[in-house]
């Protein structure tokens, strides 16, 4: 089997110490000096997180079949290293030990119960070669298995082995979960979908989850593709970590990583937490919509991402706010919640915006631009100075939807706009200019 020139091997080496060992193999390093960079942030979460701070050890070696020689690595800045001397034609291995004990969906985690990582937390970028096909090998761990949407090249029944991504950026868009899972499978509009759950002590109600999620996913596919009714991916995966108390999600092109309260899931032998389950379905809906709106329909400012510095856009009120509008609306359209329940959610969001003095101080465009330093770094003064581009963006979407319906006598709606965005910017992958939405 021939593998790409760039290969990463991830080994969950120290479960109790929460450490991954990562080997980066570079078949054709730059002989003038190979530069390596760790991302500073992850797409979808707009905060500089300095993932390099979790690297405990790093060393580089020139390797042959019979010997290896350690190479000198120079630290250039917080995220960057450079191999100073690389012989022409040599193969280089860079070996790192990375600490992983963050239960969020944004970084990496490892203990004796489970593992999870975004490749952006473990995998150094090889400057000048990030456009090349990239392999990821995951070393076996006991009775655990692997869940990810990366393309399998050579794996065992548990999923351990080699995976392939077309380039480095694509690799970063596929989170990986390790451990034992409760699995739910279904098809929505002919496309295979799965949800894998860790951390839930009771047996979940698989049939209830499959029925509800299938209906929600189909309603979202139909929102963007009312005629073709076809999803833009070959399969989709919900990676769920159920904990005592937690909430969050991070979107990816073919999957999402979710954090939820375990008692919000439907479980056999336990009463259903109605409000909590509704919140969980709304989270699933939100991140699933992102597979269209932000992962494929993107701000031009994100094409391509520069993961070393802040990437500013004034359009998060659209990409997050409109997603927030549709996440609950699709629960209603798919008949997962009643009309009164939906109206209660709209009223709650409306009241939250009206109660915040920050709505008088900051536009949603400025809130989007300042997300890195204000929304994602909230303090005691945030409600006085900041308006949520999620919440107010959802109200803008509601108002625009109603306005279009009134002016066209219900012939068109905000759905029409979303379908036009998908046709002109999603299918074509043409980035949306900062003033592009107004033109549409």
Spell out what each predicted region is.
Residues 1-2, 12, 18, 99, ...:
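Beta/coil-rich, acidic/histidine-enriched accessory regions frequently appended to metallopeptidases
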Residues 1-41:
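Early extracytoplasmic/domain-onset interaction patches
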Residues 48-57, 64-215, 219-231, 245-246, ...:
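Non-catalytic architectural context of zinc metalloproteases
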Residues 182-316:
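Juxtacatalytic substrate-recognition/specificity segment
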Residues 218-226, 293, 331, 401-409, ...:
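Sec-exported extracytoplasmic/periplasmic mature domains
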Residues 288-289, 348-358, 420-425:
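Long, well-ordered core segments of solenoidal/helical folds
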Residues 297-305, 310-390:
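Acidic/His/Gly-enriched intrinsically disordered linker/tail segments
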Residues 376-440:
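Amphipathic alpha-helical substructures
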